[in-house]
């Protein structure tokens, strides 16, 4: 028998023996969470034989709190689990039967409360993939220090923010933004203004949900972005402070303080922030008026320099009262005051077909806006039993008040530079929005595994918008009844939902159904030249959701997922107001009372490898999509929201975290999206189809001795949506950080848009006998210096999430 034959028979013997041995063994797996149902990573799990307490194997939980023991002989065993700051856990006896894998029910560890102070440090990933959402941890990135919530969103995977503040997710518009599980009820520009005033230091996590579960409102074609603010429940007094100064063309500041005090049965928390954000937009708009043969009849060119001065004060105060181990009562007060002044100085020149100047208009548009917001939330939760049965209730009242004053001064000059006319348009536009909501949620674990959830919500919205315009010309003031109006809008939405979830051996399933009834009424009061007008609508819809995860291996190295959800996008309250609002002498914004809700079907396939790399293929079909439309009438361009038809969206995306070296971490997000918009806009058929690409690339380096740095890069190709085609852009950012004051403080310096390349622009299609394009330069290169400090006093357990500059290695430090 030659050597190769010996090897062959040896291989056969080992293979057969291995198969026989494997058939007589089994696997055991499970996962570990804390009392807040959060996964506990890096816990020690010891498997012991019951009869003699002999140690069999030791495992450490992964970042999702999971563990597994393979090839264990049948018999009686138990688990010992220990983790710093938690009580040691010993399981009941576990009987293992050969050829039958065992999944242990979820294990919950209790806080020990016996240590003076325990600091548990572990490296949080920038993005975490769950069955129904992607969770972003903003503190991981150095360049997120000292910036606004809107800028953090722009750097989140799959999120795009337009110049107007419209937010899209994976190439789809119609995203609804939530704060702490509550919708913001704001228009796009008001929401953008608020998010610019919200410091990144107040954000705990950002949840990206293309297909939110039935528990959430069905609003938002592209899903929900839920921003969770920081709230500490640790015993004693603790908090953090963040001070930031930024310098671009204009300066800006962003300061905040978070405080928490928990004693006995009370927990008090607060977030207070003050910031100033000054920037500019240098905007060029060119419009060509065409003859029937396509040749240019005239050209309008407008250069605008818009300076924005924003100031904001935000406050959030709350208290929880732990009536018993089962019952918690809470109240949260929040509000902001946001005065903004936008000064638009522009020069508009009209050229004839021979490109000779016909006339010039110099204009100054000063827009003073003051937004007040106040809200109060009362919440109640009751843990019915230790198995997880729970009921909770929330009552909310929210008020938004706006005081807007507009002053538009126009001076028209002839081609020889002589003054032809001069006029001033003044507008006073107060607005008031009252929102009342009440909801109840119930959760119950089922006897054979799984969880059943149900709930209902009722919301009432009342808005009042006033527009009072006057014209001043030749020292004579007259009321402008064409623009003046009074608009009231009332909306009532009632909803109920059911949701079921269950984990099987290799499959996790979640299914839900939400029903929403919408009843709305709008009334525009007349004036001397306009009649009263009104509209009413009532409709009821069902919104199913479904999620399926499949794990071929018990440890979850590969996870395949599928999800489906039906969504609705209702028009913004202000969008239904038919009044006209001048942006400049040639551009008018108008509402549209005939807007219908948008409905979409969203599908997603995902694959996640080792909880590090997620690949997703999403498809959505949207009907009656609402978007901004541009109509050309005479020399005026009207911007108004409209239902433009249908849109199909297909996106392939990959999101992953890598560690090429122990001191080097990479985070990569890339997507390719195919968009098709089929619409009839102002009598013209429009088929705007195209593919665009985008990527975010982040590199973090641990330099030792408390130093770390970051380099990030973002690129987006030309994008296609409805009437708009935007040009490509790219930008890069860098940051460096030094830990100080025994690692409780940090100094961070970052620079955004280092090469000053973020200069958006594009073309507007479907304008009939006109063509338009725009190009802008922004105050996007900003140097920001940030100081942050964490403090605590008293007996507590601190679970600290490692940020961009924390040591790369995991360590446990006990004091």
PLM features per residue range, with description:
Residues 218-225, 233-284, 309-313:
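Outer-membrane beta-barrel translocator/receptor signature
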Residues 70, 183-210:
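Short acidic/polar hinge/loop motifs at secondary-structure boundaries
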Residues 33, 38, 44-48, 82-84, ...:
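Short, acidic, small-residue-rich periplasmic hinge/interaction motif at the N-terminus
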Residues 50-66:
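Short, acidic Ser/Thr/Gly-rich low-complexity loop/linker segments typical of extracellular
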Residues 485-493, 537, 568-617, 621, ...:
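Outer-membrane beta-barrel signature, preferentially recognizing the C-terminal barrel domain
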Residues 426, 435-439, 479-485, 596, ...:
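Outer membrane beta-barrel strand-and-loop segments of large Gram-negative receptors
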Residues 105-107, 149-152, 191-195, 208, ...:
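N-terminal periplasmic accessory domains that precede
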Residues 519-521, 555-602, 617-634, 754-768:
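Surface-exposed extracellular loop regions of Gram-negative outer-membrane beta-barrel proteins
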């Amino acid at each position: 028998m030659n050597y190769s034959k010996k090897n062959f028979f040896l291989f056969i013997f080992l293979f057969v023996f291995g198969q026989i041995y494997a058939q007589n063994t089994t696997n055991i797996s499970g996962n570990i969470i804390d009392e807040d149902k959060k996964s506990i990573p890096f816990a020690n799990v010891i498997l012991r034989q019951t009869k003699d307490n002999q140690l069999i194997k030791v495992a450490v939980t992964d970042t999702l709190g999971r563990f597994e023991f393979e090839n264990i002989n049948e018999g009686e065993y138990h688990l010992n689990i220990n983790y710093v700051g938690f009580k040691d856990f010993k399981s009941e006896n576990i009987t293992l039967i050969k050829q039958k894998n065992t999944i242990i029910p979820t294990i919950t560890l209790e806080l020990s409360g016996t240590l003076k102070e325990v600091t548990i440090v572990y490296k949080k990933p920038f993005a975490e993939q769950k069955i129904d959402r992607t969770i972003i941890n903003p503190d991981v990135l150095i360049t997120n220090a000292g910036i606004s919530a809107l800028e953090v969103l722009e750097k989140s995977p799959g999120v795009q923010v337009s110049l107007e503040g419209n937010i899209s997710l994976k190439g789809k518009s119609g995203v609804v933004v939530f704060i702490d599980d509550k919708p913001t009820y704001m228009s796009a520009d008001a929401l953008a203004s608020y998010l610019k005033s919200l410091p990144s230091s107040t954000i705990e996590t950002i949840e990206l949900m293309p297909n939110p579960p039935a528990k959430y409102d069905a609003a938002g074609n592209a899903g929900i972005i839920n921003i969770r603010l920081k709230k500490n429940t640790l015993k004693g007094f603790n908090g953090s402070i963040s001070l930031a100064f930024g310098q671009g063309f204009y300066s800006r500041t962003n300061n905040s303080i978070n405080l928490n005090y928990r004693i006995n049965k009370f927990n008090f928390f607060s977030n207070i922030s003050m910031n100033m954000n000054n920037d500019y937009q240098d905007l060029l708009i060119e419009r060509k008026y065409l003859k029937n043969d396509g040749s240019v009849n005239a050209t309008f060119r407008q250069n605008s320099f818009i300076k924005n001065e924003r100031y904001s004060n935000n406050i959030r105060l709350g208290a929880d009262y732990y009536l018993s181990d089962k019952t918690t009562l809470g109240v949260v007060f929040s509000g902001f005051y946001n005065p903004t002044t936008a000064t638009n100085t522009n020069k508009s020149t009209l050229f004839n077909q021979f490109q000779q100047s016909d006339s010039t208009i110099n204009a100054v548009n000063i827009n003073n806006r003051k937004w007040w917001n106040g809200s109060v939330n009362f919440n109640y939760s009751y843990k019915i039993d230790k198995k997880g049965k729970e009921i909770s209730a929330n009552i909310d009242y929210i008020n938004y008040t706006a005081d807007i004053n507009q002053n538009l001064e126009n001076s028209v000059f002839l081609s020889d530079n002589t003054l032809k006319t001069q006029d001033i348009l003044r507008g006073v536009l107060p607005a008031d929005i009252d929102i009342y909501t009440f909801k109840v949620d119930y959760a119950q674990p089922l006897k054979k595994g799984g969880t059943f959830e149900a709930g209902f919500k009722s919301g009432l919205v009342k808005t009042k918008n006033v527009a009072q315009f006057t014209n001043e010309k030749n020292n004579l003031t007259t009321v402008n009844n064409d623009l003046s109006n009074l608009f009231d809008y009332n909306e009532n939405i009632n909803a109920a939902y059911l949701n079921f979830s269950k984990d099987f051996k290799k499959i996790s399933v979640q299914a839900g159904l939400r029903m929403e009834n919408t009843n709305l009424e709008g009334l525009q009061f007349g004036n001397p030249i306009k009649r009263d007008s009104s509209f009413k609508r009532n409709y009821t819809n069902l919104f199913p959701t479904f999620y399926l995860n499949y794990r071929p291996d018990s440890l979850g190295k590969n996870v395949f997922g599928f999800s489906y959800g039906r969504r609705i996008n209702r028009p913004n309250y202000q969008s239904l107001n038919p009044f006209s609002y001048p942006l400049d002498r040639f551009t008018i914004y108008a509402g549209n009372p005939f807007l219908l809700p948008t409905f979409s079907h969203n599908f997603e396939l995902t694959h996640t490898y080792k909880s590090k790399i997620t690949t997703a293929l999403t498809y959505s079909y949207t009907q009656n999509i609402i978007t901004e439309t541009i109509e050309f009438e005479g020399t005026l361009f009207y911007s108004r929201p409209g239902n433009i038809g249908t849109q199909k969206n297909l996106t392939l995306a990959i999101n992953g975290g890598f560690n090429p070296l122990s001191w080097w971490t990479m985070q990569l997000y890339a997507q390719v999206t195919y968009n098709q918009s089929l619409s009839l806009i102002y009598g013209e058929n429009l088929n705007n189809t195209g593919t665009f690409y985008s990527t975010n690339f982040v590199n973090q380096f641990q330099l030792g001795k408390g130093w770390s740095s970051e380099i990030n890069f973002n690129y987006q190709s030309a994008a296609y949506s409805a009437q708009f085609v935007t040009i490509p852009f790219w930008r890069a950012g860098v940051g460096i950080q030094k830990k100080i004051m025994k690692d409780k403080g940090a100094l961070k310096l970052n620079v955004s848009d280092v090469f000053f390349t973020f200069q958006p622009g594009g073309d507007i299609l479907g304008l009939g006998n006109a063509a338009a394009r725009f190009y802008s330069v922004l105050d996007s290169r900003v140097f920001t210096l940030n100081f942050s400090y964490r403090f605590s006093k008293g007996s507590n357990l601190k679970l600290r999430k490692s940020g961009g500059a924390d040591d790369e290695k995991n360590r446990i430090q006990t004091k």
